[in-house]
Amino acid sequence: MTDLNKVVKELEALGIYDVKEVVYNPSYEQLFEEETKPGLEGFEKGTLTTTGAVAVDTGIFTGRSPKDKYIVLDEKTKDTVWWTSETAKNDNKPMNQATWQSLKDLVTNQLSRKRLFVVDGFCGASEHDRIAVRIVTEVAWQAHFVKNMFIRPTEEQLKNFEPDFVVMNGSKVTNPNWKEQGLNSENFVAFNLTERIQLIGGTWYGGEMKKGMFSMMNYFLPLKGVGAMHCSANVGKDGDVAIFFGLSGTGKTTLSTDPKRELIGDDEHGWDDVGIFNFEGGCYAKTIHLSEENEPDIYHAIRRDALLENVVVRSDGSVDFDDGSKTENTRVSYPIYHIDNIVKPVSRAGHATKVIFLTADAFGVLPPVSKLTPEQTKYYFLSGFTAKLAGTERGITEPTPTFSACFGAAFLTLHPTQYAEVLVKRMQAAGAEAYLVNTGWNGTGKRISIKDTRGIIDAILDGSIEKAEMGELPIFNLAIPKALPGVDSAILDPRDTYADKAQWQSKAEDLAGRFVKNFVKYATNEEGKALIAAGPKA
């Protein structure tokens, strides 16, 4: 048994006093009763659905609040954190010690004199590189969320659990002095890397706790040469590991969920001297337009112990997954063992030999697959490109590009080149190859079929792409295969999908110019300047 007196003393050391009761690492059964008990109001209330999962609402915050994210500027962080600047805007805004202290007082005062849930877990399936995390909250479903998402310790591990990092979730409290303090709003998600504490105020969105710790892993791990990556990962029957980077909507979860391979994890991973390891103990999947037919694994994972966020629940308790009236970002968290085909008991495997960058190019320029050189790997990793089709007033759909460093700029705490260097170093040591896979559009105006994309992924994973005859795509100088088993050869060179190749040429020149313009911000140091040659020629 864990000594609750010790936990109470540790809470007092944080400034949380006169706690009525500590509900320590509650079981799923206990959490179910707590979050559905009569008398709960507002966003604390959980609703039982016919799936067996409980659904909760997070109010106006149906996604992360990047404008309210701050990191304390101190001796430790001033020269290490990738701070926002006029030339390279990001979400790492500095906060002074006095403002931090006032926010900490607000949160600890909110949590004092309450009945609290304290959940201890690990971030990272590597014993050497994990962070022991303690989450303190007064809301039952928030305790459920972190129990799903972090790695659940054994009874033995809990006996001697010493937190490396504490998340204090005060979602019921807001900051009345935000204007005088020069902050963005009354809500806040603040980090102190010296005290190793995250404070949350005003926002009820569960993902702040998950992504907050991802940002911290993104700080601590690369500084010791360990990769920290926004990617999914799986492993084949022969132990061959593949990792899939990609922004939202590019197919990261769908393509890494493969009946022929075991899932290591779907979102956040590290790469150390042993290999690839998951940071998480669960999955946080989008549920908008979810169907049993298209995503059976996720559909069947939504059962007792899963937690639905911001979905529309009908009067009979059934869930309408097609209703995005609260948000398009409807989600479900569930423990990873709700997926059958996973690596267990520990979500880790050997070194990756295939690294796949997924992009959904709405411009119709990039090939469905190309093999990258080490320099191109760094260039396209730092660029982190994808594009969406956005409707305009006249019904014309125009592509809007997104460049997100390392396919996860929102979560980077160090300069992007540090992640690129660790990745390429790890890849070279493992003899890994990198590929750029476009799951987007081509000259036909249609999206590349999931059948062709799966065929491409199979060709990468089974090595047949290595035997293919290669050609070169001009402007981007990308190596492209001329034929692959199970893939329509007519799509492999994007120029062939246009009735008039000059059309591809002008679109390619336009997109190349966007890449070049975006990359200027990385050319501030020698490493960045050296990579310009690996990019497209505008």
Swiss-Prot record:
User: For ATP, which residues are the binding ones?
Assistant: 211, 230, 246-254, 295, 331, 447-448, 453
**Cofactor binding, per record:** Binds 1 Mn(2+) ion per subunit.
Question: Which enzyme type, at the first EC level?
Answer: lyase
Q: What is its EC number?
A: 4.1.1.49
Origin superkingdom: Bacteria
- Which SUPFAM superfamilies does its entry note? PEP carboxykinase N-terminal domain (SSF68923), PEP carboxykinase-like (SSF53795)
Q: Which CDD domains match?
A: PEPCK_ATP
Q: Where in the cell is it found?
A: Cytoplasm
As its record notes, the protein acts as a catalyst of:
oxaloacetate + ATP = phosphoenolpyruvate + ADP + CO2
- Family matches, as PANTHER family: PHOSPHOENOLPYRUVATE CARBOXYKINASE (ATP) (PTHR30031:SF0), PHOSPHOENOLPYRUVATE CARBOXYKINASE ATP (PTHR30031)
Q: What does this protein do?
A: Involved in the gluconeogenesis. Catalyzes the conversion of oxaloacetate (OAA) to phosphoenolpyruvate (PEP) through direct phosphoryl transfer between the nucleoside triphosphate and OAA.
The entry assigns this protein to a family as follows: Belongs to the phosphoenolpyruvate carboxykinase (ATP) family.
Its protein name is: Phosphoenolpyruvate carboxykinase (ATP)
> Which species?
Haemophilus influenzae (strain 86-028NP)
Gene name per UniProt: pckA
